[in-house]
Amino acid sequence: RFLLKLYFRLRLFPRSEARFNKAIIYPKPLDRNNLDKVEPSLSSDHSRHYFENFVMENILRDLPISYLEGYKTLLKMQSQFCEAENIFTANAHFASELFKVWSAEQQFKGSNLIISSHGGALYPLYTVFDHQEKIADYRIVWGLEWMRGQTRMPANKLNAKVKSYNSNGDISLIDYDGLKYSYRCATIPMGPLTVEVYNQNKDFINCLSQDVRKKMKVRPFPLGGWETKDRYIDDFGFDIISSQGSLSNTILNSRLVICAYPQTTFSEAMYSGIPTMILFHEEFWEVQPIYNELISLLKEAGIMYTDKILAAQHVESIAGDPMEWWNEPQTILAREKFNELCLTIESNPIDSWVELFRAISAGGSSKR
């Protein structure tokens, strides 16, 4: 809905570009072990660190086909696409090799590359070597900027706001799951660390009294490789799984929301006005230092926990009326600080987005 309104305000006619999803037929890979000619700059150098030499000696063997044998294929395919004045992306620059090559070629010709956060709350300390900031002409973030060249904008996907609080609703645990193998350089739990997250959540539930546990529902993460939904069913029975159809419905029909990770879901829950907590492994989720004061406030207010026993004790103490705790002065102070640092809340956020895109098109908004 937000995107359609944005198209209308900018007088753009939306269309689907299915060719980005077309199957790519790459050539057969070369025998990388028998490459005869290697650029001198890629050869070993005793002045380099051991790891740098390792990379230089192995990079030709490890480069994906798409960027060696198949790069001409991608160049040819993208040359048939339309020209773009501005390119706006939140996900495609990660997942689509064809989009990456097309957008790079367009940027070389003078297009503006605008990369937006597709979510977030407490941004990771490290994520893909700040690659997005390095390649974007405009880098959009939801909350306070922490790097030069970032532009703060209101979130374009926060819209679930409680109208009628259900004091008899569920206590909802919003779960986390990750892929089976590490896939990105970032300070988030990946691979088997996902099981550590699950074990913490399981132990937390086991610390609750039977009366409170009956009110507990889990919303499993929709994607992932560790089958956490099945694990919850095996450990607690099928009844513990939330029957709500969407994340928004889960949040809005809860008396209390407990998030298992400090990213988009945490922002959505905090924004909703429903009493919200977070229980997570702090050592797995290293975040930007701009949040240090906020983290202290969240912990003091009982919103943030890293200890499952203390979190369970807090839930037990507020389960009867979470809204009373949610409206305490100390809790409100922490909530307001979260909104100040992590969200950009405006009464009509689309106005800011329209203004940004018009300024970029007119050349009036300075590039990175």
Regions found by a protein language model. Name each.
Residues R1-R368:
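Catalytic-core helical/loop segments in enzymes performing group transfer/polymerization on anionic/lipid-linked
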